[in-house]
C-alpha cells in the first residue's frame, strides 16, 4: 500500500470513529489532535443541522445518557488512530507532526492540516494551544 493509500485508510477510520461517537445527526466536525512522543490529547466539536453552535465532545455522555466508561473507551480508540497516523509519518521517514487539524462534513468533505510546533518548548498549555488556532 502506498503512503497516500495508508493515509486515506486512516482518515476514513478517524472520520468513522468520530461519526460513531456522535449519537445524533450532525453537520460538521472540527477536530484537533496534539500528540508528541510523550503523549497528547484529541478533542472535537460538532454542529447539528441548521445550527452553527459548537457542541463539545465531552458533553455527549451527559447530554445523551451514554456511559462515561463506554465513551472514554471510544475516545481512546480515536486517540490511538491519531497516534497511528503520526506513526505512519515516522515509518515513511517524514517529520512527525505535533498538531493535526481534522475537519469534515456530513457530505464527505475533508480538510486535514499538520503543524510541527514544539508546544512544550514554547510554553503553551492546553488552552494556549486552543487559542493559537482561534
Predicted regions and their residues:
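Acidic, proline/glycine-rich low-complexity IDRs
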Residues: 1, 101-134
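Phenylalanine-focused residue identity feature
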Residues: 3, 43-44, 71, 82, ...
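Elongated alpha-helical scaffolds
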Residues: 94-98
Amino acid at each position: 500500500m502506498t503512503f497516500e493509500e495508508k493515509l486515506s485508510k486512516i482518515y476514513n477510520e478517524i472520520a468513522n470513529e468520530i461519526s460513531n461517537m456522535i449519537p445524533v445527526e450532525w453537520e460538521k466536525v472540527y477536530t484537533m489532535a496534539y500528540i508528541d512522543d510523550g503523549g497528547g490529547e484529541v478533542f472535537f466539536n460538532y454542529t447539528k443541522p441548521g445550527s452553527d453552535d459548537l457542541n463539545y465532545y465531552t458533553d455527549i455522555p451527559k447530554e445523551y445518557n451514554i456511559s462515561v466508561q463506554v465513551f472514554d473507551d471510544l475516545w481512546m480508540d480515536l486517540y490511538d488512530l491519531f497516534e497511528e497516523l503520526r506513526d505512519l509519518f515516522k515509518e515513511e521517514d517524514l517529520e512527525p507532526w505535533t498538531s493535526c487539524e481534522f475537519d469534515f462534513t456530513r457530505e464527505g468533505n475533508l480538510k486535514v492540516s499538520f503543524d510541527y510546533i514544539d508546544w512544550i518548548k514554547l510554553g503553551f498549555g492546553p488552552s494556549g494551544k486552543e487559542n493559537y488556532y482561534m
